Design a protein with these regions (language model features):
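Enriched but not universal
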Residues: 1-10
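Catalytic core of pol beta-like nucleotidyltransferases
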Residues: 10-87, 95-307
């Protein structure tokens, strides 16, 4: 079995389908009552989040309460929460005191802040996310460590300190900006994504209808090329968004955030993410079929070798 054949086994129908996004919704008058009682985080939500987080971190690290601050951030804790999304997004930013982390976990003494945050995030993705994608049956709860521990410098929509049980950045009623130049750039993304999905769909149909090995191989190659291009475009849109929430970014009003949100609303982001996930799943399956184990990526292997 080669990689192209493995990718074909993970292939499925992909379409660009518009959907609602909180960014373009009309701000409400209240915060989400499922999470807040008035402006205060419901205690049952607070305890569930901290229990999930600390139970996970204690499996791999010492004294997590000593080196973490925990914040709910993003649209889920803003006045723009009412857009119909199932599940709804709930983002939890974990701020790490890296000096204290190294004191509590001596085996990481030689690691950089970025390497530590990457290691913790990988644990969140692999081990915690499968248990939080349907948090309280309603929310997709995502934990994430930003290498910058200063929450105010990340320009979030709003930020609630879960440990101290208070607002650090109070939410404001925000409305989406309108900029003709931005729309032109978004249209280029849409056009490119539409062409990629069209070529992917054509290749997928040819793979299913191939009558001989030559036809199948050609179709699988075309499919893999479309998946690769879609993955690159998704990563560009996704990774560029982080610029909005770093020092120098404009947060909610930043172009990179608008680009993400507009492409999410049009259906471009979900479609490209399907291609990206498809590639990742195929790579993991191919590694397992070839080597008998799921191989970590190169950066992970380097980080672990330094421990």
């Amino acid at each position: 079995v080669n990689y192209y054949e493995t990718l074909n086994q993970h292939a499925n129908d992909v379409e660009i389908t518009p959907s609602e996004t909180s960014y373009f919704s009309t701000p409400g008058n209240t915060l989400d009552p499922r999470i807040f009682q008035g402006s205060v985080l419901r205690n049952v939500v607070r305890e569930a989040i901290l229990t999930l987080l600390y139970n996970h971190l204690q499996l791999g690290y010492n004294e997590p309460q000593a080196w973490t601050n925990v914040y709910l951030a993003g649209s889920g804790v803003s006045f723009n929460w009412e857009a119909h999304r199932d599940p709804a997004d709930l983002d939890c930013l974990v701020s790490v005191d890296y000096v204290q982390f190294r004191q509590s976990n001596q085996e990481y003494k030689g690691w950089s802040d970025r390497e530590i945050s990457a290691e913790i995030n990988q644990g969140f993705r692999n081990e915690l996310y499968p248990r939080t994608e349907t948090f309280m049956g309603t929310f997709e709860l995502t934990f994430y460590v930003n290498v910058n521990p200063n929450i105010k410098e990340l320009n979030p929509y709003a930020a609630y300190d879960v440990v101290s049980d208070k607002w650090v950045i109070a939410p404001k009623a925000e409305t989406a900006v309108s900029n003709p130049e931005w729309e032109s750039a978004i249209e280029r993304d849409r056009s490119m994504a539409t062409e990629i999905i069209k070529r992917y769909a054509s290749a997928y149909e040819k793979v299913k209808g191939a009558r001989n090995d030559a036809m199948r191989i050609n179709a699988e190659t075309a499919l893999a090329h479309a998946v690769h291009q879609g993955t690159l475009l998704f990563e560009d849109i996704h990774e560029s968004r982080s610029n909005a929430f770093n020092p120098g970014g404009a947060g909610y009003h930043d172009y990179n955030n608008y680009r993400w949100q507009a492409n999410k609303q049009s259906g471009v982001v979900p479609a490209l993410k399907k291609l990206s996930d498809m590639a990742k799943e195929a790579q993991e399956s191919f590694a397992y079929e070839t080597y008998g184990v799921e191989l970590p990526d190169v950066s992970t292997l380097i980080r672990r070798a330094q421990r």
